[in-house]
Amino acid sequence: MDNKLIFHDSDTLICFLEIDEIEFLKKLFTNIIIPEAVLMELNVNNAPVNVRDNLNDLISDNFVEVREVEFASGEYIKNKCICEGYWTNGRPIGRGESAVLAFAIENEGIVASNNLSDVFEICEEYGIPILTASLMLAFAYELKIYTKSEINAIWCRILQETYQILPKQTFDEYYTELFEKDCNVLLKNYDFKKHYTVSKK
């Protein structure tokens, strides 16, 4: 199986950057790709200091790769159409989400985002898998990178220490009630566990 490229939106990264869970990201991924628009969103002046510092440290370590939407490229045209609402009945989409979607469509990749209200419709249309923070946490448990109690603790910290929203109050509830459905509906049954195994070789 050839691994798909995963393009990360700001909201999934904030879940872990804001609570200083850098090691979680490093254990689950070999690298992270973000568009320049996502970098700008995460580096704004009102962003939490540790979000900016953690992100910039990961960029300095070459763990996070920043990609620019090149003028007149396939990504550029798609990004412009999505951002200005041409593909969503006139409803504009944020710059970060638009760029992530454009890269994922052009490269037949994966969108890592919690912002389903913005990305789900277009991902459905183009058959693009979606990887949420909830799915990341569940796979970290399934792959035995973390124990269930450790994942529950991270889940709780995200809800208590960030403004990010998770679909259930506890990881146990999510894993029991929604994980299988999300693998089917959002991730489109993409084998992330095999993706992890291949990427970590």
Question: What residues fall within each predicted segment?
Answer:
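Anionic group-transfer/hydrolysis microenvironments
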Residues: 11, 37, 116
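Metabolite-binding pocket within alpha/beta catalytic cores that recognizes anionic/polar moieties
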Residues: 8-14
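Structural motif
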Residues: 5-6, 110
